């Protein structure tokens, strides 16, 4: 009997069984898991946040047009999809406890399964759709202050005016405050996702500033930046600010950033970067010192400078809370820091020639972008100082503290601290372990 053919068939059958995906394997696909989490976030945002954001701003219809190759900055937040010539996301307050949400001429084969949008047949005619709902005010994405809320191009604006006609287009108003509120007021599923993002970012940052990556006298700043980007690529993450800022600080300030400067013993290294995960974008900093030959611990002067910065951060943590405008809270925070014995800086990097520790804060909105569009206690976001801080707003708690170093002839070392948090009625609450130390590279 010739057993070879039978044996061959058995081998083939076993191989097929071994290579076949197990039953239910699709439920473990990372792409599907991320999609499911984003759907949950979108449903929660549309159900919980969008009604109050539209009603508080007096807008009963919000139209977000886009076309292929010209996607609005809110494309990810609203659910993406394929757009041919022109498509629209349209949100209408028709009363009750929910907002009608419709995608017109934006294709997504998973939209029904996601469940965030209403499936309204025959919605290809935008003008007829809008006339049937007869809104009082139509919000559009234009803004002088916030680029993320300014996605409507001149051509698409002209198209809207022509398509809707003079009577309806006269009702168009800027939706920038609506967009800010919708983006920055968080639901629980977002807070979980953002906590995951900050923890991922923390782990990458702390590994980057260690001997795992850095060999003194060999590794360049660019090597560290590329290592970070490789980690992001391998883990399917975005980058909040493209190339991470990995820089050396000296008596005259920043000496080199993410370039071919070789890291040497005695260097003080700072890093500023962010990761993108599940449409959540972080903004985080870490710091390291490269021990000189014979050193076993951080020099006392640098430790004191770091400790001073930590004290400033602790005042922010204890003082900042929801319930006031960002300007009122910023004034309260800076007064509390000054009362704790620190000197408020007159302007960013405008250092006094004295023995004081100076500070400046830039606690800004974060989340849908590395620099978000919610209320901000930051000198570089003046248009958002009048926005009220609401519970669940995400903030990057950013500060700079400048302390004299004796070995620098009294010139000041700038210590930047930045970790991401949620601000509640109780105060600042961290979402992952924050920076409590200067890392040592041996």
Name the predicted role of every residue range.
Residues 2-3, 15, 28, 307:
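A general, composition-driven signal for non-globular sequence regions
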Residues 10-18:
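Sec-dependent N-terminal signal peptides
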Residues 20-22:
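N-terminal signal peptide c-region/cleavage motif recognized by signal peptidases
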Residues 26-442:
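Active-site neighborhoods and metal-handling regions in enzymes and metal-associated proteins
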């Amino acid at each position: 009997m010739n057993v070879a053919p039978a044996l061959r068939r058995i081998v083939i059958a076993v191989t097929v069984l071994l290579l076949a995906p197990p039953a239910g394997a699709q439920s473990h696909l990372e792409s599907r898991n991320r999609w499911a989490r984003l759907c949950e976030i979108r449903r929660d945002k549309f159900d919980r946040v969008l009604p109050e954001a539209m009603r508080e701003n007096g807008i009963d219809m919000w139209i977000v047009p886009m076309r292929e190759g010209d996607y609005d900055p809110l494309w990810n937040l609203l659910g993406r999809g394929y757009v041919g010539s022109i498509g629209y996301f349209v949100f209408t307050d028709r009363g009750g406890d929910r907002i009608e949400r419709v995608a017109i001429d934006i294709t997504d084969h998973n939209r029904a399964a996601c469940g965030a949008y209403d499936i309204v047949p025959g919605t290809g005619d935008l003008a007829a759709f809008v006339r049937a709902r007869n809104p009082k005010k139509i919000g559009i994405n234009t803004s002088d202050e916030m680029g993320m809320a300014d996605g409507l191009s001149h051509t698409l604006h002209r198209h809207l005016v022509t398509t809707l006609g003079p009577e309806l287009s006269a009702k168009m108003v800027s939706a920038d405050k609506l967009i800010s509120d919708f983006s920055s007021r968080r639901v629980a599923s977002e807070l979980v996702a953002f906590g995951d993002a900050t923890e991922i970012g923390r782990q990458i940052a702390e590994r980057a500033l260690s001997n795992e990556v850095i060999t003194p006298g060999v590794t360049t700043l660019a090597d560290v930046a590329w290592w970070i980007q490789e980690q992001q690529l391998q883990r399917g993450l975005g980058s909040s600010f493209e190339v991470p800022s990995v820089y050396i600080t000296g008596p005259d300030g920043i000496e080199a950033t993410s370039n071919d400067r070789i890291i040497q013993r005695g260097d003080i290294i700072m890093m500023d970067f962010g990761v993108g995960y599940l449409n959540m974008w972080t903004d985080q900093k870490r710091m390291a010192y490269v021990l000189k030959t014979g050193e076993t611990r951080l020099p006392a002067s640098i430790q004191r400078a770091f400790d001073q910065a930590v004290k400033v951060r602790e005042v922010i943590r204890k003082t900042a809370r929801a319930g006031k405008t960002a300007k009122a809270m910023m004034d309260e925070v800076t007064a509390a820091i000054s009362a704790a014995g620190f000197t408020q800086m007159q302007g960013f990097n405008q250092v006094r020639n004295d023995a004081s520790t100076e500070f400046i804060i830039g606690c800004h909105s974060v989340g849908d972008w590395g620099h978000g569009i919610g209320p901000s206690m930051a000198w570089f976001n003046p248009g958002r100082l009048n926005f009220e801080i609401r519970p669940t707003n995400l903030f990057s708690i950013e500060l700079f503290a400048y302390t004299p170093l004796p070995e620098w002839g009294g010139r000041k070392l700038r210590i930047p601290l930045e970790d991401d948090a949620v601000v509640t009625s109780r105060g600042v609450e961290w979402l992952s372990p924050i920076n409590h130390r200067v890392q040592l590279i041996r």
